[in-house]
């Protein structure tokens, strides 16, 4: 027969094991959520084919008829969670099946909860012919909750473009305001340092892993406007290489998209990137970039797993710049 002391010890050990397993499971779930990709390649190919089909349809039909079809909830261009929206290059919405209130409205400054100007980003993608970007938008299949979305946009002609996207529903999407403010301050500090000390001295400081511009996983990266890597303290082997077409695990060209932001002066963007504290595994990152001058730009980013990023609880915000 077991003594009461042994039985109590057994209960305590079992309880400790349960707590340990629960913590491990939670950590694993968090890591999965911050590193999620569109792991079904057919989803990406389906998205591309869907947008190209809509683009070709728009080129074959007159614009009014095409936009009417794109705005039809029960039409041929609404397939599950895939649907087509369309804008002209001024940012005027010309078609949307789930936001009829958008049609005819100027949405060029439409901003998601983390400061990403999604219509400008999608327009830049389509100006290149076609390309991907990330943004947050309400998911009509999930009670209009704000969710991260990988969008794909394609130019119809010189006047307008069409787009669609795939929701990444499990990823945390809201980066705390304090984290974003600290990110902006860090980048501003780096730009000021570059302006006061010159490009050569600044790049030397930015690439010093033991220097003041590497603070754990918060560090400065820098490129010229051709996509040549100038500062990557955790990836020195990439310095001097052409990274213009570098893609994340979902095919998003994050350097090109960053250049788009820098050409506007500054801006936010999402991408998946190697996390130095996780053996360089890719995970969701919110980046902020600024131009230094007409020749080069710099930026930094915060990882979702390290900034207390959270999931949506409701559709909270899709506003215009200056209204938040």
Predicted segments — roles?
Residues 2-13:
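Bacterial N-terminal signal peptides that target proteins for export
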Residues 27-324:
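N-terminal membrane-sensor/transducer module of prokaryotic signaling receptors
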Residues 5-6, 22, 320:
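Generic short N-terminal amphipathic or hydrophobic helices
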Residues 12-22:
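Bacterial N-terminal signal peptides
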């Amino acid at each position: 027969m077991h003594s009461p002391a042994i039985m109590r010890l057994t209960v305590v050990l079992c309880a400790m094991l349960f707590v340990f397993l629960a913590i491990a499971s939670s950590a694993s779930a968090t890591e999965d959520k911050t590193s999620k990709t569109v792991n079904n390649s057919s989803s990406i190919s389906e998205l591309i084919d869907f947008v190209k089909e809509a683009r070709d349809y728009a080129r074959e039909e007159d614009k009014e008829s095409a936009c009417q079809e794109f705005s039809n909830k029960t039409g041929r261009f609404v397939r599950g969670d895939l649907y087509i929206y369309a804008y002209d290059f001024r940012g005027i919405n010309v078609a949307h099946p789930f936001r009829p209130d958008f049609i005819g409205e100027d949405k060029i400054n439409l901003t998601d909860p983390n400061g990403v100007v999604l219509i400008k980003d999608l327009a830049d993608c389509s100006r290149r012919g076609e390309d991907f970007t990330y943004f947050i938008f309400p998911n009509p299949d999930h009670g209009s909750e704000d969710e991260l979305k990988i969008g794909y946009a394609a130019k119809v002609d010189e006047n307008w473009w069409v787009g669609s996207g795939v929701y990444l529903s499990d990823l945390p999407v809201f980066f705390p305001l304090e984290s974003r403010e600290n990110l902006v301050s860090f980048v501003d500090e780096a730009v000021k340092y570059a302006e006061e000390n010159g490009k050569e001295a600044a790049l030397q400081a930015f690439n010093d892993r033991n220097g003041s511009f590497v603070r754990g996983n918060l560090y400065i990266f820098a490129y010229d406007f051709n996509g040549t890597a100038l500062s990557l303290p955790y990836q020195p082997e990439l310095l001097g290489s052409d990274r213009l077409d570098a893609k994340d695990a979902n095919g998003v060209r994050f350097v090109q998209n960053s250049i788009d932001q820098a050409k506007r002066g500054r801006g936010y963007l999402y991408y998946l990137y190697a996390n130095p504290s996780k053996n360089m595994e890719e995970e969701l990152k919110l980046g902020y970039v600024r131009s230094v001058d007409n020749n080069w730009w710099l930026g930094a980013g915060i990882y979702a797993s390290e900034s207390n990023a959270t999931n949506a609880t409701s559709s909270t915000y899709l506003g215009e710049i200056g209204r938040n």
